[in-house]
């Protein structure tokens, strides 16, 4: 049996570092939290290669005295608490005294620091936990931490670091969350010598949101502010039509500390229930202030998890406040969405008032986006500064719609359906049924020499052949044909695109931008034509017809969320979009069809294989035999 050995300090520190230093992003978190605790009013973060090779955090805080510099790198040394009782009252972000010791154990560190009352600064260089150089230097008041070559001495940890883009995205998320926690601090974030964002440090949360996220993000938020003895709650929540595919933009702070909380998420999502689609999540930036004794932040080494001592009260407070704000803001939200130009507003309503027959004519003459459809676009010269309405052009001269679409042109003629049975069939009728084998035979053999009787309720095509009557759901039939067409395009990676008359420039948060650029290969086969366009922006020159007319570009954010969650675009998501597109383009119930249109639709149905169901699973074809009809009339038993 092996003997029990006492590990040396170097090994202990490397192992312990794993609890604190998960990667470059956790180093950034610890260093910036230290800078905030030091009272800095200006903090700069600079990274290179996703923080794996270089991280610099500079603040103008109180600095560290020359007497305390060495102690700062010792484990469990801190200026923030002195006893266990202090944990229940501390407002500082750090308190364990482990960060610098852990970081210096697995990287190369330079620290330059100077307190206000000291005439010189101290430069300290540490490699693998050992001080290699220390000297006096001239420097401004504050502290600069430079971290190089993370995990240089722990190859297994280095091997499992994520890609540069992925690490950059995690750091971008972390710095944005920390900037939002401290609106009174001016933050500057630099990635590979490019300034990503700066915040003004004017003390207003709205200023930080506008600096960190895209303009559209802030425009869709609702302010929330509650001040009660037991709890203060302030920040922003999203309008009900501004949601994401995951919870990554549910941002919570408790007493200024960035945390993740299932309890708070559940309270907010319950308030939104019934107001937003299933599997969508509201966006929020909320700061909660409570008595420090009512929360335990020492749950996890990352200090992002929290345990509330009064969970039920917290849940109900948040749920009630969010519910109230949503109910009060519904009217305001509608007013804010009114376009600034009166003519545009009137035209929008005019388009909605087009009667059904006109809409159907358009939908059957062209598969895709109509020139009358408007989208919100950005002027290329001004990049993402302002959005203006522009027309979208379908520039697909070589892409031919299916034959039935070209031939189905609604006319004023209406078939005489007086010969159709006028009495309603009993609901419990056993005569109407679906049968795959019957459908197969019907498609391949019996769709010949039939007699068109007409339309029933302008929704169902009625045909007669031999001793049977067949009912065809015109919408379901056309929808299935379009679904197959679009699905085949996707399988062959020949998805038709629509060129935008004016390309659209979209601005993203840095983390979303990095995710999109890193996974751009997921978007190209879907029919997108897009590329990087300046800082945190992409330009879209074409979008897939598959995704229907681009009234807005929320589907881009949905796809980004898919990639974040699943590492790729889920097939189910694409299938759902195909179904939606097919449903919108298909002939509708109450469309009046002439005899030529009906015959063309039936000819196209010959291409289908059973089961004859629409993409939603509803039957396309039903049959009623003469024998069954005679039984209904009691002519036979």
Swiss-Prot record:
Alphabetically sorted, this entry's keywords are:
DNA damage, DNA repair
Q: Name one GO biological process term.
A: mismatch repair
Q: Quick one: a GO cellular component term?
A: mismatch repair complex
Record-linked SMART domains: DNA_mis_repair, MutL_C
Keyword DNA damage among UniProt keywords: yes
The molecular function terms of the Gene Ontology recorded here are: ATP binding; ATP hydrolysis activity; ATP-dependent DNA damage sensor activity; mismatched DNA binding
Concerning HAMAP family, the annotation shows: DNA_mis_repair
- Functional note: This protein is involved in the repair of mismatches in DNA. It is required for dam-dependent methyl-directed DNA mismatch repair. May act as a 'molecular matchmaker', a protein that promotes the formation of a stable complex between two or more DNA-binding proteins in an ATP-dependent manner without itself being part of a final effector complex.
PANTHER family (UniProt xref): DNA MISMATCH REPAIR PROTEIN MLH, PMS, MUTL, DNA MISMATCH REPAIR PROTEIN MLH1
Family in the record: Belongs to the DNA mismatch repair MutL/HexB family.
- Name of the protein in question: DNA mismatch repair protein MutL
Organism listed in the record: Alkaliphilus metalliredigens (strain QYMF)
